[in-house]
Amino acid sequence: MNRDAGWHRTPLGVIRRTLEAAVEDNIPFLASALSFDLLLTALPFVVLLLAAVGYLVQHQITTRQLDVHELLERLLPLSGSDSADMFRHAEAALSALVRARGRLTLLGVPLFLWFSSRLFGGLRVALNEVFDSDENRPWPVAKLTDLSMVFITALLLFANAGLPALKAQSAAALGDGFLVAWLYRFSLELVAFGFSTGLFFLIFEILPSRRLPWRTALVSAVFCALAFEVGKRLYALYLARFVTLDRVASDANLVALFLFLLWVYGMAYAFLLSCEVAEVVDLIRLRRAQRVGLG
């Protein structure tokens, strides 16, 4: 009994309490539901990405007075026996993408808004379940909250996606200095980590019906961002080392698909586990406040 009452005094006790709370709140089941919603949201998101590629290609064709064939010659300087066939396939696919960009947009926008708002609605329900709070906001307010998080997330993701382009453009300007280049790359990594932490912090602060203390939300956001970055880099390492485009149905590519599904589930589980971390940190803060009050 005394050991259970003093769980907050040792790191092992905190970890044990967090895992027990995860089991009590059915975190594995909730993570499966969130993974399914995330995969559904990814489908119209890919459609919108293809539409964006079509608009970008059309913009290049219009501004530079080129056709698709000439544009591909600049982008894909292929050589070898198979280059002609690959070039024809790429030209046909890109031409079809340019023609279908309008239809892809009309299809992708409503589906993306629907499934992404459904995803954040699921996150809202899961957060309320973990934090033991009922949804006391009216339904229109709750749905507007979900949609606002959709646009905030899209804005942060686009800003984060622009970092590799900024890194590539500024690589030549930095020169050959190792220390300067390393510091610049490290600063970009910190900015990317800051984007992830900021996104998770906003999710913890906006979506639940019960407002968390900002310090508790920040601890959970950092935990979730660390788990996301570690999982992303491990998966990218596997893709770089083993995945090949020569044979789509190779064993390595099939394993990559399985690992992607596992990665999605792992990220959903880590997100919900970070909610439990927030709850445990809040309990520790209350225990310490009670000890100070009684002392």
Residue ranges and their predicted role:
Residues 1-295:
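Membrane-embedded alpha-helices and immediately adjacent juxtamembrane helical segments
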